Structures are given as C-alpha cells and as structure tokens.
Design a protein with these regions (language model features):
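N-terminal helix-cap/turn-to-beta initiation motif at the start of protein domains
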Residues: 5-17
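A short, Trp-centered hydrophobic/proline-enriched beta-strand micro-motif
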Residues: 18-26
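Short, surface-exposed beta-strand/loop "edge" segments at domain boundaries and coil↔beta transitions
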Residues: 28-33, 53-60, 75-87
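Short, flexible N-terminal segments of the mature chain
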Residues: 32-44
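Structured surface patches comprising rigid loops and adjacent beta-strands/short helices at the edges
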Residues: 38-40, 54-73
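Basic/aromatic-rich interaction segments and small domains that mediate binding to polyanionic partners
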Residues: 44-53
Length: 87
C-alpha cells in the first residue's frame, strides 16, 4: 500500500481502461455505488466524480487526510470516520 496525491488519483482513474468502478463508502455513510465510465475532475474545493458525463458525487477535498493505493484499489480517508474506496 502506498500513499498518492489527488492529481495522481485523477490520472490513474481517468487513464484506466476499466468500464466500471465501485465506489464504496464506509463509516458514517455506508453505500456501494456502481459507476460506469468513471471520470474524475478536480476543482478548487471538490473532487467531482462523473459517470458517462453526468456528475454523480462531489467529495470535499479539504477534508481528505490521505489517499492510498493498493492493487488498483484507492482508499480515500477523511478527517472524520469516513472512507471512500474506489475499486
């Protein structure tokens, strides 16, 4: 497992050849969301997650503590008891 930054996460997801990703939320909010043709855009305050050119979710990037990569799985840990896994 190694730590990566937001820009590396954006590049790895956007350059991936996978057709479908799972966004798994763990913590205060628990949910599994299937996303087809996932793309990520970074702006001043948010990581915006898109599926087929439609915005699905925004994650506040100022609350991110760290992003880790483990075997094509990305784990985003927030400053609360919340994690988002992208598989």
């Amino acid at each position: 497992m190694c730590q990566i930054n937001i820009n590396e996460l954006e590049a790895k997801i956007n350059n991936s050849t996978k057709d479908e990703f799972l966004l798994e939320l763990e913590g205060t909010i628990n949910e599994v969301i299937k996303i087809s043709n996932m793309k990520i855009l970074i702006d001043t305050d948010y990581i915006k997650i898109y599926s087929q050119d439609k915005e699905k979710m925004k994650l506040n990037k100022h609350q991110i503590m760290k992003i880790e990569e483990k075997n094509e799985e990305y784990i985003i840990s927030f400053d609360s008891m919340q994690k988002a896994k992208i598989k």
